[in-house]
C-alpha cells in the first residue's frame, strides 16, 4: 500500500470554524488549462478622475457631492442592498416551514480609503506612502463606524466590514474603497463561527489547549490554533507576523492563496477593544499582506477581504462573548496573474461536505504558503505602485 502523503494524495481537512470538511486535491494543478483567463494588464490610472463617483469633490449618481476629503471619507450608500425601513413581520410559517420569509433591515456605507484614484491598500506601504500615515486612518474609520452605527441604530445587531478588490471579484470602481453593512441580524457564517468558538471553550477536553485565554479564563479556538501554528516546526503556514498579529494560510484553506489575519497575544473581540499600538500593528500587517500579494505575480492581486468580530455591544449574548476579531482574505488567483480558481460543480453540489478543492501545489510544485513565504523574503517595497512602475519604465 502506498504511504499517504498530504502533498500528493487527495484528502479532507477539517475546518473547525465552520465545522465542515474541505476536500484537498493537490494533483489538480497539474492539469492543462484552456479556460478563461484574467487580464494581467496594469493600467496607469490618474490620481484624480473627474468621472469617478468616489473621487474628492465629485458628484455621485444621485446628485450628492463628495467632500473634498484628504484621508478617508465615509458616506451612506445610495444603492444599498438593505434599507433602513421598519416593516411588520408576518407569520409566514404556514407551509411546513418551506416558504419562510423574514424582513431584513439595515444600512450600508462606502468607505473611501484614500483620495487618490490610483492607489490600493498594498500601494500604501511604499514611499511616499506608509501604513502609519495612510492605513491607520482607515482602521480608525472602521472602528468609529462600528461604534457610531451601533450607538445610533438600536436595531443593528451586526456590522460587516469588507472590501472587494479588482474586477475579478466584482468591484465596479478601482478607486480604493470598502463597504460597511449594518444588519438587524447576525449573518449565518459569523453565527456558525461564534458557536464553534463557544463550544471549543466550553468543552472540558480542551481545558489544556495552548495559547492565551479568553477573559473568562477558558481556552479559545483561534488563539490555540495561532499558538500551534507559531510553534510548528518551520512554521510552514505562517506568512508573516508582528508584535500583535499573525498572517497565515489556514490549515483548512479553500483558496490557493487564502490568508487569515488574527491576534496571537491576547483576546480581541472587536475593533473597540484595540489599543492604538494594536491598531498600528494591524495597519502594518494589512499593508504587508496586500503588498506581498501584489508582488507575488507582479499584478494588482484581486481578493475579497472581510472582518469577523463581535456583534455590536447591545446584541452580545453568551455566544458573542467568545467571538474573536480576525480577517479573511479570499483571492481567486490560482497559478499566475491570469489563471483564477472557480468554485463550481462539485463544490456547489456538495457544499454541506466541502468548501472546495484546496490546491496545495502551485505550477512549480511547491505549496502556496511556501510560494508566499519565498516571496515574502524579499523587501516589501511594492513593485506595481505608480512610483515604482514609472521608475521601472525609465
Spans of features found by a protein language model:
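Gly/Ser/Thr-rich active-site loops/lids in small-molecule metabolic enzymes
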Residues: 279-285
Amino acid at each position: 500500500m502506498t504511504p499517504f502523503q498530504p502533498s500528493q494524495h487527495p484528502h479532507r481537512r477539517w475546518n473547525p470554524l465552520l465545522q465542515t470538511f474541505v476536500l484537498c486535491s493537490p494533483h489538480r494543478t497539474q492539469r492543462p488549462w484552456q479556460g478563461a483567463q484574467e487580464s494581467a494588464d496594469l493600467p496607469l490610472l490618474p490620481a484624480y478622475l473627474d468621472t469617478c463617483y468616489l473621487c474628492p469633490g465629485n458628484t455621485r449618481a444621485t446628485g450628492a457631492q463628495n467632500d473634498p476629503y484628504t484621508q478617508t471619507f465615509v458616506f451612506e450608500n445610495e444603492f444599498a442592498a438593505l434599507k433602513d425601513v421598519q416593516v411588520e413581520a408576518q407569520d409566514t410559517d404556514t407551509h411546513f416551514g418551506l416558504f419562510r420569509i423574514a424582513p431584513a433591515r439595515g444600512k450600508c456605507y462606502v468607505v473611501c480609503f484614500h483620495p487618490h484614484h490610483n492607489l490600493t491598500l498594498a500601494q500604501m506601504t511604499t514611499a511616499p506612502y506608509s501604513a502609519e500615515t495612510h492605513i491607520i486612518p482607515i482602521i480608525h474609520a472602521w472602528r468609529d463606524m462600528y461604534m457610531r452605527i451601533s450607538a445610533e441604530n438600536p436595531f443593528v445587531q451586526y456590522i460587516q466590514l469588507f472590501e472587494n478588490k479588482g474586477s475579478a471579484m466584482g468591484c465596479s470602481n478601482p478607486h480604493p474603497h470598502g463597504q460597511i453593512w449594518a444588519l438587524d441580524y447576525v449573518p449565518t457564517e459569523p453565527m456558525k463561527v461564534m458557536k464553534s468558538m463557544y463550544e471549543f471553550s466550553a468543552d472540558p477536553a480542551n481545558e489544556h489547549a495552548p495559547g492565551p485565554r479568553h477573559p473568562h479564563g477558558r481556552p479559545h479556538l483561534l488563539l490555540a490554533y495561532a499558538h500551534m501554528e507559531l510553534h510548528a516546526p518551520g512554521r510552514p503556514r505562517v506568512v508573516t507576523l508582528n508584535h500583535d498579529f499573525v498572517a497565515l494560510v489556514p490549515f483548512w484553506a479553500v483558496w490557493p492563496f487564502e490568508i487569515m489575519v488574527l491576534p496571537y497575544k491576547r483576546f480581541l473581540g472587536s475593533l473597540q477593544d484595540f489599543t492604538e499600538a494594536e491598531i498600528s500593528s494591524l495597519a502594518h500587517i494589512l499593508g504587508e499582506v496586500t503588498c506581498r500579494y501584489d508582488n507575488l505575480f507582479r499584478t494588482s492581486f484581486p481578493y475579497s477581504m472581510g472582518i469577523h468580530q463581535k456583534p455590536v455591544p447591545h446584541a452580545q449574548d453568551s455566544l458573542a462573548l467568545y467571538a474573536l476579531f480576525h480577517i479573511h482574505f479570499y483571492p481567486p488567483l490560482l497559478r499566475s496573474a491570469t489563471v483564477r480558481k472557480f468554485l463550481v460543480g462539485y463544490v456547489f453540489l456538495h457544499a454541506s461536505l466541502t468548501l472546495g478543492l484546496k490546491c496545495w501545489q502551485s505550477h512549480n510544485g511547491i505549496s502556496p504558503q511556501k510560494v508566499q513565504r519565498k516571496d515574502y523574503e524579499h523587501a516589501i517595497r511594492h513593485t506595481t505602485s505608480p512610483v515604482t512602475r514609472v521608475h521601472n519604465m525609465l
